[in-house]
Amino acid sequence: MTKTLLIALGLLAAPLAATAAPLDSSDQGEYVLLDKDENPTPMQMQFVLQGKQWIMNGREGGGQWQPVCQGTGECRLVASSAGEVSRWKKNLPDSWQPHNFGCINNTAFAFCRVDHASEAGRTGYWWFALTDGRVVPLPVNRLQ
């Protein structure tokens, strides 16, 4: 009985081990999407935490910031579940699997901070397009 309980608890805790702390105010900033060769694209995003709600602005090239997701409707950004994060991570190379992801998402995309599993303070970001049942991961660089 005790062995069965320990196994069950271990299985329940396993998804949590691969999930980072949720995004917080330190993740506010400006980011640029990278292409498949990790070169910057013209698409830039700005994530801002207003109270407990994330909002996103976007711009192309050096243009003006435009509101994209302002915390309402289908564009509202919410904290992602461990199950969602696990599903998105499957689309990344094996080298990313052990790292800890904390994400926000809506119906169209997810934005994730990745904390390195063994090197404290080493952080990266991914953006996942969620379209037509497909998950398309794109790396992101922080600008500010």
Where are these regions (language model features)?
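Beta-strand-rich cores of mature extracytoplasmic or soluble domains
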Residues: S86-Q144
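Sequence contexts marking disulfide-bonded cysteines in secreted/extracellular proteins
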Residues: Y31, V68-R76, G102-I104, F111-R113
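Positively charged n-region of N-terminal signal peptides that target proteins for export
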Residues: M1-T4
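Boundary at the C-terminal end of the N-terminal hydrophobic targeting segment
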Residues: A18-P22
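N-terminal glycine/threonine-rich, aromatic-flanked beta-hairpin/loop signature
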Residues: N39-V85, T123-G133
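Short, solvent-exposed loop/hinge segments that bridge or flank secondary-structure elements
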Residues: L23-I55, N91-T107
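Bacterial N-terminal signal peptides
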Residues: L6-P15
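A structural signal for short, hydrophobic beta-strand segments that form beta-sheets
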Residues: L33, A82, V140-R142
